[in-house]
Amino acid sequence: MDISYIFVICLMALCSGGSSLSQVEGKQKSGRGRGSMWWGIAKVGEPNNITPIMYMDPAIHSTLRRKQRRLVRDNPGVLGALVKGANLAISECQHQFRNRRWNCSTRNFSRGKNLFGKIVDRGCRETSFIYAITSAAVTHSIARACSEGTIESCTCDYSHQSRSPQANHQAGSVAGVRDWEWGGCSDNIGFGFKFSREFVDTGERGRNLREKMNLHNNEAGRAHVQAEMRQECKCHGMSGSCTVKTCWMRLANFRVIGDNLKARFDGATRVQVTNSLRATNALAPVSPNAAGSNSVGSNGLIIPQSGLVYGEEEERMLNDHMPDILLENSHPISKIHHPNMPSPNSLPQAGQRGGRNGRRQGRKHNRYHFQLNPHNPEHKPPGSKDLVYLEPSPSFCEKNLRQGILGTHGRQCNETSLGVDGCGLMCCGRGYRRDEVVVVERCACTFHWCCEVKCKLCRTKKVIYTCL
Amino acid sequence: MDYQYFEEESDYIDLDEEEEDDDVETAGSLDHRFGQPNSEDDYYFGGEDEMEELVVDGHGVLELAGRLLESMQSCVQPSVLQVMQYVAPMLLLCLLCRLLCLLYSQRRRLTSLAPLHLFHFACGLIILQLTVGYRLLLLLLLAAVGYLLLQLLRLGRRGAQVLAVLTVGSQFLYELLIWRRRSDWPQLRGIQMVVNMKLISLGFDLTASGQLQARIPGPFAYLGYIYSPATCALGPWVSFGCYMDCLVPRNSCLVSLRRLLPNVVFCVLAVTVSNCLAPALSDFFGDSSHFLVMYWDALSVRSSHYFVGIMAQALLVASDQRLDGATKESDMLGPLISQPWRIEWPRSISSLVRSWNIPMHEWLKRYIYAPCKPTASSSRGRTLLAVLCTYLVSSLLHGMDLRIYLVLISLALLAEGESLLRRQLASLLNACVTANLCPGKERCRYSHCPSKRRLNSLSYWLVRLTNLAFTALAIFHLAYLGVVLLGDGLEVGEDGDSFLWHWQQAGYLSHYIGLGTFVLYLFIS
């Protein structure tokens, strides 16, 4: 490579990097926690205790934004689902990250503060996961609540039913999903999707990069829920023929969605400020200028806060870059985050509503029309299901309350593992302590019909390793 | 609806029962037989152990309940809704057809039957239109071809045989030519199968006494018969004579309505089990026991068959159409197409096969098995030929589906082996352990018969236990064979190994057991 060329590139990288950083800083100040305060709803109370009137509860009042309060008021029964969803998100997040340095810890919730702590102020991978999983959980639990009938305002959309099931199954019998539309109330995912957009995306206007990142990750979470909505069909008929075919949709267990999102977390795409930041045109191509302007690798070694970034090796270990594998389904069109893209069925009335509400609706849809460019121009642009982040994650090794990092002191680790949960990585090389403890646990359980489990209490010795 | 048809064995099984031997040897042989169900029990117990482990964390039962609830919510409602949308118009059309026929027949003099046939034809046509849409034209074309073939009957008995061969052959040809190209053939196949059965039966019936007795039915009668609303969409087969008998409804509407209701309820129940409950259970036991997975998957297949059968029963009841043959008519449900209770808890494989699809069984017995086996005292070779012939015809009727061929041949061999062995055992032990239920206290020829013995006698319990073991074995075979038929019969042929996966997992156990049965039989006799 030509030296002068490299020089120019570095110069440009510095310029744009600097400017992007300053912008990130700026919006952290202005947009801090804007759309994320609602997470606190998880701690408001037990889902069971919530009655429809409780949207007036002061705790909820302080947690939700005005528009969110209105949504909750207008959709009786939704509050319980939201609380459930938020708790679902937290427990799933903590499950997925149980073996990592950052273990999705939540803080004691107090009003005006963010549930997941200050880590959310940074646009790092972990933040992207938080946004995606919370949005996904809300979609999931609302859809589930819909099908359970606990939300009064989500009616079954009978416009989706085929005129007669018979008319479909012939064509669908082999071609599969092609032109089959589900019937009944099983398409509540549409309501969940719509509601999640209205509710979760409230504070995110998409005006700056961080808000775009949040929007993108929220959308990605919803897209994962939608993708896990499986159609199942069964043929009935004489001699294995397909005279009667019945189909239904099934929403997968949230654990599956959590697993998928975690995989996307591992292969998340780092995005950067582009020249077309304010372009609302969905079809704006990746500008060659912007793409070429920054050739710094995505492992972020050149970022100024070097004290906090991972070492190269650890970074690889922790983040397992594999955008190429995970982007296999991002065909060219899916670069555009058209809201209806993942499944045209899900938002049947988008067109109608758009027509009815005119301009307002149009503006709202534009919110999702943007293109994020990968930090490393050699990577593919993020697809609709990919998570995106802006800056490298801190190492999470040392306690840093200013940044909301608890550190890994006192965490348990696995001595034999070579992965992130192994003591070497988990304790950041500080060393670890070996303790023998006597654990009392239930054992030799027997099942008595029906339905009782009787167990003995056993004392076993266990060795645990704790980071210093 | 119908993977059965070897029931015919039953006919000759009871014909010759001689050969008395001593009881000594049989004790050992019984042990062997008991050994098999035990191996199956191992599966069972294995499964229960696993279940306990699942339960250990205290969530097993809850989890199962949760999953069931979940699948119920997402699956039952749409399934039932779609089934209702499917069945309701058909039922209404059947009732309409019945009403029209009733009104017409109440005229003073019945000048012509043609309007009755026309009502049937029109209603059937509307049902088919609702079911298959424009593909109806293809069916009508095939019906026209069938009518042309029917003219062969002018040749007499020989013509009927040619007709049968041509019909079955052409069905196979359609499969070969159309199936590959058309994605919708699987839907038409079942309908066309019933039409073919009706054609063949018509041919044999008309030429029964060697000469052409009656005129070949006119086009209206033919079309009315072929596309009668009660039987056109879902079957079952009814003979032309039976159709003519029921042109004018006899039962009162009240009786029909009373029978319709339980049919509809059971229909919904069956589709729920087939779509939702069985797959959920199969999922739940997915990691613990392969036998349970097979069992639940096969239950899904079986209840799918019950579902179609009961739906067809509802249509029969609605249009007051009766079935041929031994009057298997229950007071509650009307004509019976299958007897789920005999399938879920079978006495033997052959009795199971006979209860699977009664009209189809009747058809095969009447038109294929009986002609192939002219006299009762025929040689064993002749009988075997008749069985093979029956197998071949029913396979061909079912169309090109490798899975069905495999299942049918396995069923035939298993049923044959079991019947032979049990007959031998019965005569050896002088106990009522044959494949067929003993006819009762007076007529049972064996001395050790549960109906003759008191509860506290040892032989009573031994006979009971033996039959129970055979039942358990049949249940295992049923799960083993049924699981293959799960899923669409569409992608067969491309990946032959995928549907044999379960058999591989089970180590082809059923087939070895079947083989063992034959060996044991030869050993004893």
Curated annotation (Swiss-Prot), chain A:
Positions of the UniProt region annotated as Binds porcupine: 83-106
Can you tell me which residues are glycosylated? N103, N108, N414
Please give the InterPro entries that the UniProt record associates with this protein: Wnt, Wnt_C, Wnt_CS
User: Into which family does the record put it?
Assistant: Belongs to the Wnt family.
Effect listed in the UniProt record for changing S110A = No effect on glycosylation
Per UniProt, subcellular location reads as: Secreted; Synapse; Membrane; Secreted, Extracellular space, Extracellular matrix
Cross-referenced Pfam families, in alphabetical order? wnt
Extract the signal peptide range: 1-17
Which pairs of Cys residues are joined through disulfide bonds in the record? Answer: C93-C104, C146-C154, C156-C185, C233-C247, C235-C242, C397-C428, C413-C423, C427-C467, C443-C458, C445-C455, C450-C451
Role played? Binds as a ligand to a family of frizzled seven-transmembrane receptors and acts through a cascade of genes on the nucleus. Segment polarity protein. May be a growth factor. Acts on neighboring cells to regulate at least one gene, the homeobox segmentation gene engrailed. Wg signal represses arm phosphorylation. Wg signaling operates by inactivating the sgg repression of engrailed autoactivation. Wg and Wnt2 have a role in the developing trachea and together are responsible for all dorsal trunk formation. Wg also acts in the developing epidermis.
Molecular function per GO: cytokine activity; extracellular matrix binding; frizzled binding; glycosaminoglycan binding; heparan sulfate proteoglycan binding; morphogen activity; receptor ligand activity
Q: Would you name any one GO CC term?
A: extracellular space
Q: In which tissues is it expressed?
A: Segmented expression in embryos. In embryonic tracheal cells, expression is in stripes flanking the tracheal placode.
Record PTM text: Palmitoleoylated by porcupine. The lipid group functions as a sorting signal, targeting the ligand to polarized vesicles that transport wg to unique sites at the cell surface. Depalmitoleoylated by notum, leading to inhibit Wnt signaling pathway.
Disordered: annotated segments: 333-362
Q: What is this protein called?
A: Protein wingless
Topology with regard to the membrane?
Answer: Lipid-anchor
Residues covalently joined to lipid (O-palmitoleoyl serine): S239
Q: Which PROSITE patterns match?
A: WNT1
What are the BP-aspect GO terms? anterior/posterior pattern specification, imaginal disc; branch fusion, open tracheal system; branching morphogenesis of an epithelial tube; canonical Wnt signaling pathway; cardioblast differentiation; cell elongation involved in imaginal disc-derived wing morphogenesis; cell fate commitment; chitin-based larval cuticle pattern formation
UniProt entry keywords in alphabetical sequence: Developmental protein, Disulfide bond, Extracellular matrix, Glycoprotein, Lipoprotein, Membrane, Morphogen, Secreted, Segmentation polarity protein, Signal, Synapse, Wnt signaling pathway
Listed result of changing T51A: No effect on glycosylation
Per its UniProt record, what PANTHER family does this chain match?
Answer: PROTO-ONCOGENE WNT-1, WNT RELATED
How the protein assembles, per its UniProt entry?
A: Monomer; folds by intramolecular disulfide bonds. Interacts with porcupine (por). Interacts with wls; in the Golgi. Interacts with en. Interacts with the proteoglycan Cow (heparan sulfate-bound form); this stabilizes wg and promotes its extracellular distribution. Interacts with peg; the interaction facilitates short-range diffusion of wg.
Organism the protein comes from:
Drosophila melanogaster (Fruit fly)
| Effect of loss of the gene | Accumulation in the Golgi, thereby preventing secretion.
